[in-house]
Amino acid sequence: AKDLDAFAKRVARLPLKFQPGSKYHYSIAVDITGLVVQRISGMTFDEYLQDNIFAPLGMKDTFFEVPRSARERFLPNYFFDPESGKPVDISLAPPPLNSRKNVAMQDYASVSLYSGGGGLVSTAMDYARFAEAMRNGGSLNGLRILGPKTVDYISTNHLSAGSGLAGFGEQPGVEAVDSVLGFGLGFGVVTDTTKTDVVGSVGEYN
């Protein structure tokens, strides 16, 4: 899809897996949340993130579309070529891989689909600043982007007892412990370390 509006229209044509509120299944809901932010704020999702999260936290190297001045520091995306057994720069790959446009994970130089669920590129230092702000309850160096109660709420498990991260079967090790990995508002939450192979602490979110 060329942008979030077109993406949401395509998603809306798909049949429901089940009635909303009756079950939990990991989904693309957070992708659609980006469109909700656009509609409420009157800004594009990338503009909203820049003005309300990245700039206040001093995250100068986090973008959907990498500016030309920063591209020499940006590593290209690679895919594994089974024929040669080697990684290949996706920009040098034959069609149809190199012809896909406006896909944030591939075409970082020309992006129009600002997804709520993925596509940002960043640096370890920028991400550390964001993580530290979350660890501090929504603030960094005296600048607040979220209230402490909001951080607590979004990082608390909101699934009913017995529900877990269903839908992650394609990721090794997760399906077996999905009943003890809860989900907040955009974060997976550890609810019981005695029944999981995931190393962590109760209440940990990621």
Locate predicted features.
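Short, surface-exposed loop or secondary-structure junction motifs
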Residues: A1-T196
